Amino acid sequence: MLDVKDIFKSIPHRYPFLLVDRILEIDGNEKVVGIKNVTINDNFFQGHFPSRPVMPGVLICEAMAQVGAIFAHNARGGMTDDRVFVLTGLNNVKFKRPVEPGDQLRMELTCLKRRGSFWKMQGIATVDGKLVAQAEISAMEVELA
């Protein structure tokens, strides 16, 4: 299990764009499970939508991608100052239910393919055991200029 201090060592994201609160499980190079506790204080709810706050789908995908980056960084020994994982693709994205304040977003990513610095993962996001989103996520480790 990784807490927020460990997450800070794994990815460069910080408030307000850090969308992972905890990693519950890392199963070697196969699978990772992380959570985001969604609160009304999340800044994206200010305009999406004031009368019925809903977490934007693209941010659900970003949260899954951040969990995937933590997974990949851990598989190779942690984050370094000169390298970062970047999102290279999203495929077969589906949104099934809204994510609202008070929900705990659970994200499970499974490694589909890994070749060199390239990763392809299947991401599934749930709330209370119900599917809210799914996507194939591709990412690549790159050197910072």
Task: Locate predicted features.
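Catalytic strand-loop segment that frames the active site of acyl-thioester-processing enzymes
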Residues: 15-55, 60
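Residues located in well-ordered beta-strands
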Residues: 19-22, 89, 94, 108-110, ...
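Hydrophobic beta-strand-centered segment that forms part of the acyl-chain substrate-binding groove
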Residues: 1, 68-106, 132-134, 140
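Short aromatic-glycine motifs in intrinsically disordered, low-complexity regions
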Residues: 2-14, 81-82
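A residue-level signal for conserved active-site and pocket-lining positions in enzyme catalytic cores
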Residues: 23, 64, 109, 129
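HotDog/MaoC-like acyl-thioester-processing domains
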Residues: 28-29, 100-103, 110-145
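Active-site- and interface-proximal helix/loop "cap" or "latch" segments in soluble metabolic
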Residues: 55-61, 65-72
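Beta-strand-rich interaction surfaces with strong enrichment in secreted/lumenal proteins
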Residues: 8, 51, 95-97
